[in-house]
Design a protein with these regions (language model features):
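Acidic active-site catalytic centers that drive phospho-/nucleotidyl reactions
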Residues: 16-17, 55
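Non-catalytic signal-transmission and effector/linker regions of two-component phosphorelay proteins
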Residues: 1-13
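Acidic, metal-coordinating helix/loop segments flanking the phosphotransfer/catalytic sites
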Residues: 38-56
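Active-site T/S-Asp motif of two-component receiver
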Residues: 59
Length: 59
């Protein structure tokens, strides 16, 4: 197995059209210590990227 990665404080954007998936990812990532920004589509994500400067983007 690989080493555990410390995500504490990482800014993560989750892009998905499913509210259930966005919220599930948010719960998991917040528990891992991440700051989470949610977007429901690419247009929403583009509007938020400039303001939040995420370290990681999941889509």
């Amino acid at each position: 197995m690989g080493e555990a990665v410390n995500l504490n404080g990482a800014k993560v954007m989750v892009i998905d059209d499913s509210n259930t998936i966005r919220r599930s990812a948010e719960i998991f990532l917040v528990q891992a210590g991440c700051q989470v920004v949610l977007a429901e589509d690419g247009f929403d994500a583009l509007a938020k990227i400039a303001d939040h400067h995420p370290d990681i983007i999941f889509c």
